[in-house]
Amino acid sequence: ITLARKAREVGVKKFVVTHANSGIWKMTYDQIKRCIDSGAWIEYSYITNLWGQGTGLPDFERMSDKEFAGFARIAPEHSIITTDLGQVGMPHPVEGMRRCIRALLENGLSQQQVNYMVCDNPATLVGLSAI
């Protein structure tokens, strides 16, 4: 939150708070909203739903798709979704994104909300479209 505020103060136009749903430093709803209010984009990584026992990353607790969708629902117009995949013993990144999109839709997010997070917002961040 402090870095998000400072980035805005010094004039950074685009910045991303990554892994907001990570078990290591899982952000609260209020923390996420405060970062967004400071101009941040929020990134949620679906790897949290794929790691755990029986995977290439067995030491981490798996998040439920319902909980992940709850994070994504906070502000889809200011969020991006990644898989953070590519590790040995984990699904291929494309398969991970496929699972993520399916989980978001099955947990009540609209197709438009999903499009914001996996298409429109990432394109905006890298300058391929205008807000």
Task: Go through the PLM ranges and name each one.
Residues 1-26:
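Divalent metal-binding pocket/active-site signature
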Residues 5-11, 31-39, 69-76:
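Acidic (Asp/Glu)-rich catalytic clusters
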Residues 17-28, 48-66:
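Active-site glycine- and acidic-residue-rich loops that bind
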Residues 95-131:
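Mid-to-C-terminal alpha-helical segments outside catalytic/metal-binding sites
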